[in-house]
Amino acid sequence: MFIKSKRYLYVSLFVFGLIISLYSLVMLGSNTYFFGDLKDPMTIRLFAEHFLLFISFCLILNFVKKNNIKLYLIVFLSMLYLSLHQVLIALMLNIVYVVALIMLGELLLIKLRAEYIEESYVCRLLNNFVIGSLSYIISICLLSAFKLASIRVVKLYSFGLVISVILIYVWLRMLKITPLRSLRPDNCIYSLDFKKDKYMSVVVALTLSVLLLQLGRLNIAIDYDSVRYGFRSLFVLLGDFGIYDTLGTVNDVYVYPKGLEILTLALNTRGSFSFILSFSYVCALLTLLAVYEMVIVSRLKKVEGKVLIDNKRALVALFFAAITPAIINMAISAKTDIITLLMQLISILNMCLYIRVRKLYYIVFSLVSLLSSLIYKPTAPLFSFAVGCAAVIYLCLEFCLKKYYKKENVKKENIENKKSKKSFKLIALMFYPLTAIVLVFARTYILTGHIITSVYSSIWYKLGIGTHFPYTVDEYNSAGVNLAGDVKVDMAYRLYQLFIAPTKEEHIYIASPTVLLLVLIVLGIIYAIIYRYENKDRERSLYKYLMILFIAVTTASALGLYMIHQIDGNYFILFFCLVIINVCLLIESDDVKGLLTATTPCIFFAITVLSVTNWAGVKGLTPAPIAGREFGFYNHHDRKLDTLEGNDFREVYYDLTKLGDPRTLLMSDDNTLLHLCLDIRVYADVVGSGGNVAIVKTLDNFKRYLKFAGIEYICTEENYLAEHDRAKNIIEFMLEDGSLEEYKSYKDVRIYRVKAEQF
């Protein structure tokens, strides 16, 4: 053994973690607003409230004897907290919606499940969610193809679908047609015993507190990207007839694969964003569940005729994932990262189950989930390709090794071959992801001429495949998304920013893995070496697969870190999850306490960073409801109007509303009108990254765009025009030639009416 005593290892890691945490803290304090955020009264209140929650959970877990009473008390306390912060109704509605999608998947797979059923109940639920989500997305796309998908139809259809699915599922359960349980045996014993492992009650209490913290600030964590496109699907995704309508958007972000936005169309309201954010949060819970189950599945073993389920290590893995800001901060954003991560983890979970039991249908489910990830995020192909490559490499190695070493009788081979041939009907499952990919990417193709944009646009242009107006104007193409380009990249400095100190770049700071992941990487390398040399006689197929997977994802992450201009931590959340999973798989159950002790400084540092960071940059928790105005959910629309007293954009909002919410081009950096859910197109989208500056190169091009987009009014802000000469010149030229007239003037803001008849 390389290290005589594990105690020395954990003491060394504790000291290393403490030093690196203090260093990172000092660097954050000197380069960011970290210390100022910590001193803010709202942050202090957050810490006080959650310290009380943490103590309450610890007392319940340690002093209440009956498990059912523990559960009731925790649920009651959580519901009280959620009601205070106005997220209970939105969360419950989303839980019902996600459960309905899971039930829909179960109903669609009912015939298949008569022959094939997952050994893991959690995996079965997650596979159901994948199939149910794909089916819903396909149905909305088909309604759009037949020009039937107005917002009213989508909401009525979704409501009817949820009610019908729940009623049919309950009816089939009463008739005992659907399987009532998984194949997980009844004779299970669990490694976690709160009486013996009292320190685990602290882990559970911290996990619950952190998860509630995210819900407590969910309503106020309204980030720029979510407002820009996540919450505005009713105006930038769904037209009068469906998702394939031309809505006058000019930026790559509006033509990305919109799987998540389609999935949440029915949850989209003008009054509150809580419903969409709660869906992301539920997806984050499913992601944590996938991490938990992956450790469970990978460490299953029989002891004296009983199945040992190592839920202690699984719970630690869930805990580490829940306190990593880069991962869990995605739970309160309308960004697509968390659902993409969920699909990738479901794929990996199915592969782990295949390696455990050697049943072909797990490979099919794994491929279904992996392909599903492509419809949610444009950068998913990079990391999903790495996951797919790892699976292919492992299967090829397995096939070659079996062919070389296997000397079993022919009968057994024949039986296995028959089972494999019988399993080929599972390939029909590929209909769901492939159809969804075609229908979702069809929107991008119809609107742009490319099947996928973002970082891939330059490839199509080099192949001679052009885009439609306004993504191509004359000979000028859309700018696409910035890569690092020819700029020399200092990888060591980027790694330093990502894992130790983000310096002054706030976008890294709010999605930081913190030094916790750095310590876990060091520990993972040590344990991988120990496991490799101490377990020569054990079954190590799963270990081999996870190592291949880890190398593949690490390579993809390094490539992304090198190529991508902006190194947000959320790009690498799959890598972070795999680090956590691998560490928790490689340690022994008896070493869990040592692991938690060694990482204590990093754990508290990660929780501290998490408490003051989110994509919106807000501090504190959602305020209490306004009596007589808010009934169970947060009214973002009215709350925003309340903050605009004396602001010109408040009057602009009322005037545009009186006009019937005409499509308006906004020349301002203020996103108030976007927040208030008006039909707005933004000038910065046209000329910025992902847009096409050629639209404003000539006045004729700009007029052509206004006509194409159906722009009826232009709203300008004086300060913005003073900083953007071209925007100012365009307004002046159009006023001179009579194609624009002033409709209303305020202190710093003006509304102009576009006279399209003059074009």
Model-inferred region functions:
Residues 1-188, 702-703:
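Membrane-embedded, hydrophobic transmembrane alpha-helices
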Residues 52-63, 284-295, 493-544:
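Hydrophobic, aromatic-rich transmembrane alpha-helices
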Residues 198-204, 308-315, 361-369, 384-388, ...:
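Signature aromatic-anchored transmembrane alpha helix within multi-pass, membrane-resident enzymes
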Residues 208-299, 304-309, 313, 317, ...:
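Active-site lumenal/periplasmic loops and adjacent helix-entry segments of GT-C-fold
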Residues 221-225, 230-232, 608-654:
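Membrane-proximal, lumen/periplasm-facing interface regions of secretory-pathway glyco-
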Residues 235, 337-343, 373-376, 381-383, ...:
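Hydrophobic/aromatic-rich transmembrane helices and adjacent perimembrane loops
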Residues 397, 425-505:
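Membrane-lumen/periplasm interface segments of specific transmembrane helices
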Residues 641-686, 712-719:
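Short periplasmic/luminal acceptor-recognition loop of GT-C membrane glycosyltransferases, typified by
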